[in-house]
Amino acid sequence: MLRVRCLRGGSRGAEAAHLIGALVGRALSGRLSRASRSSSSSAAAQLPLSAHEQVPEPTAEECPVCAHNEWDPLEEVIVGRAENACVPPFTVEVKANTYEKYWPFYQQYGGQTFPKEHVQKAVAEIEEMCNILQHEGVTVRRPEPVDWSLEYRTPDFSSTGMYAAMPRDILMVVGNEIIEAPMAWRARFFEYRAYRPLIKEYFRRGARWTTAPKPTMADQLYDQDYPIRTVEDRHKLAAQGKFVTTEFEPCFDAADFIRAGTDIFVQRSQVTNYMGIEWMRRHLSPTYKIHIISFKDPNPMHIDATFNIIGPGLVLSNPDRPCRQIEMFKKAGWTVVTPPTPLIPDNHPLWMSSKWLSMNVLMLDEKRVMVDANESTIQKMFESLGIKTVKVSIRHANSLGGGFHCWTTDVRRRGTLQSYFL
């Protein structure tokens, strides 16, 4: 039987301390203001913000950002944009994360926009997805449109951009904190700029905002001689713990982490290194525990099409990429569900992902799931679990590298911090 432990006051440790600190800060601020009413205007001029710009300290109920897991009732979400999406240059880290049959595509179109007609269809699909989310009672927010074709240069590399299609890759909400991930692809170095207006708004309304150490993305971060030839090579390398990213500096994509209350699960992948995982462990302890899990996966990148937690003690586990630690979950009383084989046809382009985007679903709450309208077999699987399916077709959007979970970051879910993994 699954054991659940509710933590009083919501998020214990870090968030409780934050709230107590806020109350103490207010009291101290009041005393100081009374003591300094006669102070000079020159001292006031040294304040970093004017009176109308002061950032408020919210109560837990007022904070616009709060999510503890992947299944509590969804109230607000960021949905990405396909507009202006560009093919990333064919660098070593891109090669390691893509399938060989698409390498000629990257070699030909790297630095250019994705096929225009395909992107237009993806844009229309995501707009419809947003409309359906709003119909389901969810507030939808979007990143800013950006011209990703512009070339940029740092002291260590030059590149063009990619897109702001997958907010799950760059933003992770833990409690009332937004964490910006230090992603590993050079083409995504400035992706955060599309989200900054939203993040600043949430911050001004009381959310906590953390940017993980920005990687230099110097050559030392990548194994320039990473030996990629066949899928068998990839299996061997992954089994040996060898990846295209080194331990030169911390890097991670937020989509390699998945939340279950006080327990957060992560994989070491082509874009997430152990330094990045350790940074998250130190940053989130002691309230949260980070568990490293691994899979029989020749191309590990993002956990949510391999291991997707859809409810308290309920997880979808990809049969093609079995979890090496699955007994750990069974012993904790979890139910492990094997999703059916995807139905997406072989001739549909998936430039950055596999067909298993069928299991990359978005839970609207414990009893509602957003699922691909074309994937009838997984719809039946959810219905057998007593979960209502909200069907949307995003096949052309899938081609850009993500399913519903990838295309979103949940900003606010109604619930409390609990332990599901005792």
UniProtKB/Swiss-Prot annotation:
Tissue-specificity statement: Strongly expressed in neurons and glia of the brain, the lamina propria, submucosa and serosa of the small intestine, in oocytes and on the fringes of the pancreas. Not expressed in the retina, eye lens, heart or bulbus arteriosus. Expressed in the yolk syncytial layer in gastrula stage embryos, in the yolk syncytial layer and mature somites in early segmentation embryos and in the yolk syncytial layer and the liver of long-pec stage (48 hours post-fertilization) embryos.
Gene Ontology cellular-component terms listed: mitochondrial inner membrane; mitochondrial intermembrane space
Key words of the record: Membrane, Mitochondrion, Mitochondrion inner membrane, Transferase, Transit peptide
This enzyme's EC code(s): 2.1.4.1
Record Gene3D superfamilies: L-arginine/glycine Amidinotransferase, Chain A (3.75.10.10)
Enzyme class: transferase
Family matches, as InterPro entries: AmidinoTrfase
Key word Disulfide bond present: no
Gene Ontology MF: a single term: glycine amidinotransferase activity
PANTHER family linked to this entry: GLYCINE AMIDINOTRANSFERASE, MITOCHONDRIAL
Subunit relationships: Homodimer.
Protein name as annotated: Glycine amidinotransferase, mitochondrial
